[in-house]
């Protein structure tokens, strides 16, 4: 295949703007899918991806297309996830392309995540051209949306392709635009092999499968290859392309996209963004931009039924094979037993992993409240990173604590601005700017502590704006904050699973809500139970569950007052003794309640 007849492109779109359906139409039009294989969202392989209508793992597909100029082209569609949690995967997938289709819903207009991904594409020097999808809808306003694209993103949209993926309108025009507007890859097949690894996953029978875009050189079956970041060498057992099913080819050359199977056992070795080269004749400079992805949000996962611990461990190990950005380590809690502390890229990532565990492995799980990574600077001059309240050192050792901040951009119709500003202020946000993109669409930019966003920010944003707002965020930096550890004590004993790290100004209100919630949930005992919220030794809120009391005077009809007094005193003594030895079993609901208070 001549390199000037190759086009590598991706589709950039916000959730629900019709990206996967458009990909289906392109596959059908170029004959990559027969009628028999047709199914909606062909590239979204996981059930979860189909149900939520989102793309989680990148996929690629090779399309053969004969253009109007009579030449045959190979078009490589590299499907990217659209969600903010997977930004790094998106940026690597985009780095494998020369161009992109910006798909915008003609009835909705530009959304926050579209914007974030377009900027990523422009940073990677991609040639981007707009496509207005869903023009068959009665609510479609192509002219308004074209104007929006020009105003907000600064792309020339006067000749944007009008399409409807559902009805199959505009498919040919899109393919022609790809051939005309997107430049062919640059690369030298004679140079040493240099390829960008932009996705990898684990296959039960063949080990790790790598998706790579060749920048220079040629890769043949049987070649000895090396991954630059780890320096390990492997033999290329199979080389091929997805069309859209796996098909082996004798070789891949510069500019092409394909898969390599090299008997790699662990996905953690095949890191996204790494450079693949020949062992004997390596390239001199690896590709830039490789970074290790670090989890930002942590949460404990515990099996409701403790006998499922082993199953949970195996399930996590299997998920880890496909998702190297997810991390876990065992932890124990006095209240919940044995479980794992897991790290995720963000909230959506966390939900997806939990749902996959419950769905694919039939596990029943409890998840503790999500937390973020704090930096604790100690008086003796060192700094430690912690991700749960139980790791926080005693107050007297701490100099100060820092927490991560994010820059959030929220797109919303203008009637909801007031509610959103109030929400951001409540979450200790710092306002950066408010931009009116059009008379009815507003972009609000805030700096927010990630700690506040993880809990319930997204849900509340959606409910304030009736689902119309879209949120995108990027990580900013760490800042010094007045953070304290709040303990929940029951009869004077700290319950470790209920401790949390919280801002001092909010501790009093949270403590009050928590203890009153717990009061409803703890069953009454034969003795009274004190529930307290405390910071260090200072109790900031308290509720008491009153004791159940047996009527010891029932057997005395009339009779002497001293007799009654003796019985009451005896009962009082007994209660006192019981309180010293009695312990309270916390019901499962109490732990879930903690999470609910946050909602």
Swiss-Prot record:
NCBIfam families: lepA (TIGR01393), small_GTP (TIGR00231). It is an enzyme of class 3 (hydrolase). It catalyses: GTP + H2O = GDP + phosphate + H(+). Required for accurate and efficient protein synthesis under certain stress conditions. May act as a fidelity factor of the translation reaction, by catalyzing a one-codon backward translocation of tRNAs on improperly translocated ribosomes. Back-translocation proceeds from a post-translocation (POST) complex to a pre-translocation (PRE) complex, thus giving elongation factor G a second chance to translocate the tRNAs correctly. Binds to ribosomes in a GTP-dependent manner. The gene is lepA. It is a peripheral membrane protein. This is Elongation factor 4. Belongs to the TRAFAC class translation factor GTPase superfamily. Classic translation factor GTPase family. LepA subfamily. InterPro entries: EF-4, EFG_III/V, EFG_V-like, EFTu-like_2, G_TR_CS, LepA_C_sf, LepA_CTD, LepA_IV. GO terms for biological process: positive regulation of translation. One of its GO terms (molecular function) is ribosome binding. It is found in: Cell inner membrane. GO terms for cellular component: plasma membrane. GTP binds at residues 16-21, 133-136. Residues 4-186 form the tr-type G domain. Keywords: Cell inner membrane, Cell membrane, GTP-binding, Hydrolase, Membrane, Nucleotide-binding, Protein biosynthesis. It holds the Pfam family EFG_C. Its EC number is 3.6.5.n1.
